């Protein structure tokens, strides 16, 4: 049971996409219509890594120092990962602050966090070095997170792999939903936060196949509805949470996927 607040972080969620498919997204569009939504200015740079770091810490990128996946200041014109460790976040995140105030938290698959750490509640990390970590470790058997499903980024890289890539994304969202559903059912906490990656990822890889205005749009194709279908999957789950957790406030947040 989550007593005070459920936060679902839906990465890359685009309001324009929701409006475009509003007839098929009654829960997401209904929330927009009922509660309105704020037009917020993004952090700079407007990228996934610094944006979620700001969401976690409340700090501007100039303060938390997490700027991008790559070192954009390098003189060499090469891809250089900008390495940061959990120490950049530990003790500074909103769930750490809530813990210090005596509130328990469940944190599911947080973006940017690698090995994770013990908190008052539950933490399930994203895959890192071939492993997903569950804290406390005694709860791993309850959740059994599937690293073979969630840890497959980069497996499919060519155009001929698009059908397999599509299937991979939908397997991932199902696993992210499964873990979140289990946590809501099993954890007696004050606040739950769960991060969903697939809306962002599928838009990166399939946008040109779904948008007739994209300069590389190939024309009618078998993948032109995959983004819509991913939003439908998320809409269905948001509806499930609203129906089953009527006494717990729900907050949807996102970051600019690009």
Report each predicted region and the residues it spans:
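His/Asp/Glu-rich, glycine-adjacent segments
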Residues: 59-218
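Extended hydrophobic/aromatic segments used for targeting, binding, or gating
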Residues: 205-241
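Metal-dependent active-site segment of extracytoplasmic phospho-/sulfohydrolases and closely related
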Residues: 7, 27, 229-258
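Glycine-/proline-rich flexible loop or hinge segments
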Residues: 10-14, 33-39, 47-51, 70-83
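Structural motif
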Residues: 7-9, 191-195, 251
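A residue-level signal for conserved active-site and pocket-lining positions in enzyme catalytic cores
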Residues: 11, 55, 98, 194, ...
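Short, structured active-site-proximal loop/turn typified by the sulfatase FGly-forming signature C/S-X-P-X-R
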Residues: 18-63, 104-106
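Extreme N-terminal starter segment of soluble prokaryotic enzymes
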Residues: 2-6
């Amino acid at each position: 049971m989550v007593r005070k607040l459920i936060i679902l972080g839906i990465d890359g969620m685009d309001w324009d996409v929701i409006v475009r498919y509003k007839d098929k997204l009654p829960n997401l569009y209904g929330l927009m219509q009922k509660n309105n939504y704020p037009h917020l200015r993004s952090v700079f740079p407007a990228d996934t890594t610094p944006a979620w770091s700001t969401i976690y810490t409340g700090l501007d990128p100039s303060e938390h120092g997490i700027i991008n996946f790559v070192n954009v200041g390098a003189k060499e014109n090469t891809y250089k990962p900008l390495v940061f460790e959990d120490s950049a976040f530990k003790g500074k995140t909103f769930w750490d602050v809530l813990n210090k105030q005596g509130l328990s938290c469940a944190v599911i698959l947080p973006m940017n966090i690698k090995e994770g750490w013990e908190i008052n509640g539950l933490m399930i990390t994203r895959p890192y070095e071939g492993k997903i970590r569950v804290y406390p470790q005694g709860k791993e058997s309850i959740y059994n997170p599937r690293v073979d499903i969630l840890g497959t980024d980069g497996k499919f890289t060519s155009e001929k792999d698009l059908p397999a890539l599509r299937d991979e994304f939908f397997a991932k969202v199902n696993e992210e939903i499964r873990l979140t559903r289990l946590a809501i059912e099993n954890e007696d906490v004050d606040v739950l936060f769960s991060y969903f990656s697939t809306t962002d990822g599928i838009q990166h890889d399939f946008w040109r196949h779904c948008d007739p205005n994209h300069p590389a749009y190939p024309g009618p194709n078998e993948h032109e509805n995959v983004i819509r279908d991913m939003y439908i999957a998320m809409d269905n789950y948001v509806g499930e949470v609203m129906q089953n957790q009527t006494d717990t406030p729900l907050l949807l947040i996102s970051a600019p996927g690009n």
